[in-house]
Structure formats: structure tokens, C-alpha cells
Amino acid sequence: MSNVWHNRTLALAGIIQALNSVQQIARQGNAPIDTVAASLASVFKMNPKSAEDVYGNIEGVSVGLQVLNQQLNRKSYRTDPELLRYLTNIMYLEQRLKKRPRILAQIADQIKHIEPQTEELSPADPLIIARLADTYVNTISTLTPRIQIRGEETHLRQPENIERVRALLLAAIRSAVLWRQMGGTRLHLLFQGRQLLYETHTLLKRIPRAGAA
């Protein structure tokens, strides 16, 4: 049972981490490159051996786990309604996506064509990001409702930021797929927050220099 929640928590942290980076780009014009790279790398894990393998290891979603802890911990007073709205929208889009096998196949095909470039380039390289952004536009962006990102217009109008946001939304969808594969549902978010918080604490303790507040 604990292993199930372990996997669900990792997947949820993966979604949160990608969306948190989206917020940082929208609000500040940038996000930590290592965190962005870790999220984008998950897109290329098409046949992972485990949930942890999707992110390389637990450290791959360390930021997501810390932010998730803040959202689930009522004592932190750091609940972010905007982040939760993005999370709900991503999960809704993933539900629609699973009913569109042609789009799923298109995504898989495009990712397979991009993947060889990651042998020489970082997942956060502008070239990789541009191609992932195109994949998002050609597939997920055709579904409704489209996710509306809020932030500073000066940041959101910059082409490189637009591409980074789209690539990260694709990464969020990838983690949402994992969440569903692990049996996660929106009801779990509503009624199993305490279980998710417990598992978040457990995972954070395994990460050097990370801790649960």
C-alpha cells in the first residue's frame, strides 16, 4: 500500500514541480535551469522501470516535493490557489487526452524523434525546448479548455519564455499520465491529503539537505 502512495506522491510532485517552474517564468521571467531540466527529462522516459525512474531519482522532483509539502501542510499558510488551479486543469486535460489515442500516438512519435538529441544536449537546451513546445502546440494545445497562464506580460510575451512554458506544460501532462497510471484520482487530492503529506515527508527525508516543514 505504501509503495502505491510513494508512486502517486512522486507523480504529483512531478506535476507540481513543472507547474511551479511555469509560475516562476510567468512571474519573474526565469526558473532554475536544473529544475527545468529535471522536469523536461521526464518527458523522454517513455518506458520507465519505476516511478522514480521517470525522474532519474527522488532528487529529480525535490523542488516539487518541497512545494507539494507547502500546499498540503495547513500549518505552512502557503497554499497557492493559482497553482492548484493549474493542477486541476492539467489533470482535466490528461483525462481528455487519454480518450484521444491519435494525439497520444502523435506525442509519442514526436518525442521519439526529439530524444536522440538529448544524448548531446540538455533537456533544457533551447533547441530541445523549442521542439517540445512545438509538440505541445500540435497536440495538447488542440484540446479544450486551454490553460491560461497568468503573470507579467513582459515575461509572457518573450518567445523563449513562451516555449519554456509550453515545454513545461508538456512535462506536467507527462507526470499527470503517471499519476493516473498509479491509480491517482482527483478524489485522492480532496480526501487523501494527509496520506500524501505523510509520504511527502518520508520522501523529503531521503533527499540530502531537504526537509519537511
Swiss-Prot record:
Transmembrane segments: none annotated. Disulfide bonds: none annotated. Belongs to the HflD family. One of its GO terms (cellular component) is plasma membrane. The keyword Coiled coil does not apply. This is High frequency lysogenization protein HflD homolog. The keyword Cell membrane applies. PANTHER family: HIGH FREQUENCY LYSOGENIZATION PROTEIN HFLD. NCBIfam families: PRK00218.1-2. It is found in: Cytoplasm; Cell inner membrane. SUPFAM superfamilies: YcfC-like (SSF101322). Gene3D superfamilies: HflD-like. Its main location: cytoplasm. InterPro entries: HflD, HflD-like_sf. Keywords: Cell inner membrane, Cell membrane, Cytoplasm, Membrane.
